[in-house]
């Protein structure tokens, strides 16, 4: 830009160290597969890392691996105990491969999805790791979500419309309505929910459209249970089946979201559901990769 550009790092610019593109990605994958992390742990950690991105000011995201630093490592939504367990396993893998932890977190999420889909998930290396000294903790406090519909998380200390916050989060991530829908349905089908609410599948290790199939099943009658959640009862057997949140049920009550949910719930949309989930997932993982041209 010119000879007078300052050489020092400016903390308000959220600096990130230069990443490494030259390492064996397949070797990293093999090491992750060999560890005892579950699909849910890997996918949820990768989502937690990348989903802080805000298209409005281009802050947050997976680059920098600031999920291992304060304040993000202590956010309730990130399940600090589970997060530290996952990071303790991924750190030595990253160090041995010469990769950044930021890259390895995303690779682990992709490994989880590859286990759940049997398909190859696109990946672009080159993320760097930030240090605590490069991170203005106070400025990152405002990125903490009061709700994350994708993980069925709500901070009970705030009063808000959960569906509106869901739309706000999707907009911050730059997602379209179909992308938001397929990501939420896919995350639930993988058993990812902060408190277990909204898990409507019997096989959480397979990425499927089960969530929307069960949600829209006319045999299920949903009733409030007093804690902001809803219980389904089978009309045919009278048996209580599933518990869901307001965010889950808005995909049945809102006409536009229901249209999307019905499309993905179709028997002939199973492959389309998986393909669209992979595209939307990759979009979020790469949201802050301003160094990528394609």
Regions found by a protein language model. Give the residues of each.
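Long, well-ordered alpha/beta core segments of mature domains
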Residues: 1-294
């Amino acid at each position: 830009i010119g000879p007078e550009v300052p050489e020092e790092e400016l903390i308000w610019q959220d600096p990130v160290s230069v990443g490494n593109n030259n390492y064996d990605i397949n070797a990293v994958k093999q090491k992750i597969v060999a560890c005892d992390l579950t699909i849910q742990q890997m996918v949820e950690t990768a989502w937690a890392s990348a989903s802080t991105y805000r298209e409005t000011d281009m802050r947050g995201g997976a680059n920098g691996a600031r999920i291992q630093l304060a304040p993000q490592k202590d956010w309730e939504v990130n399940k600090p105990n589970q997060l530290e367990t996952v990071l303790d396993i991924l750190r030595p893998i990253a160090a041995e491969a010469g990769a950044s932890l930021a890259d390895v977190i995303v690779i682990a999420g992709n490994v989880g999805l590859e286990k759940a889909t049997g398909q190859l998930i696109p990946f672009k290396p080159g993320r760097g790791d930030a240090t605590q000294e490069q991170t203005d903790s106070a400025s990152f406090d405002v990125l903490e979500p009061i709700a994350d519909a994708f993980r069925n998380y709500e901070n009970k200390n705030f009063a808000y419309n959960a569906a509106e916050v869901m739309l706000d989060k999707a907009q911050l991530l730059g997602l379209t309505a179909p992308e938001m829908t397929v990501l939420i349905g896919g995350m639930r089908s993988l058993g990812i929910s902060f408190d277990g609410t909204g898990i409507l599948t019997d096989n959480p290790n397979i990425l499927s459209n089960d969530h929307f199939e069960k949600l829209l099943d006319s045999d299920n009658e949903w009733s409030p249970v007093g804690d902001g959640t809803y219980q389904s009862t089978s009309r045919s057997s009278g048996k209580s089946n599933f518990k869901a949140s307001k965010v889950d049920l808005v995909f049945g009550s809102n006409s536009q979201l229901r249209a999307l949910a019905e499309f993905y719930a179709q028997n002939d949309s199973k492959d389309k559901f998986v393909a669209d989930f992979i595209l939307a997932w990759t979009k979020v993982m790469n949201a802050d990769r301003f160094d990528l041209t394609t």
